[in-house]
């Protein structure tokens, strides 16, 4: 399985309730693409699920599977609106916005001097002659 990221991937879902697999609508809002187009079946991705009524949310790693409907399996929860790392029990019948994201804890950031921070480690500079370990 490949971890794949893509810009502007979003679909909605009507929550079945619970903490299991999310059934996606198969349609993307204007200006977005579907998981099928952007991620592809069998690939993992970072995602956010937002309950548009209660504003509960979770960020995680999931696997998209095409079908009727396409589904997103919630494999690893990285964070949620309660401050934990467990799957959110979304309210049955609520509309969910499901989209690809790049979690802050997984990002690599360059400071103003061009030094990369990976987690709590400084280690790489894209400027010639500077390296920090």
What do the PLM-derived regions correspond to, one by one?
Residues 1-31, 78-132:
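Glycine-rich, low-complexity segments
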Residues 14-16, 39-41, 54, 64, ...:
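A generic structural signal for short, solvent-exposed coil/turn residues
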Residues 59-61, 67-75, 124-130:
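Short, surface-exposed terminal/edge motifs of secreted or surface/virion proteins that either
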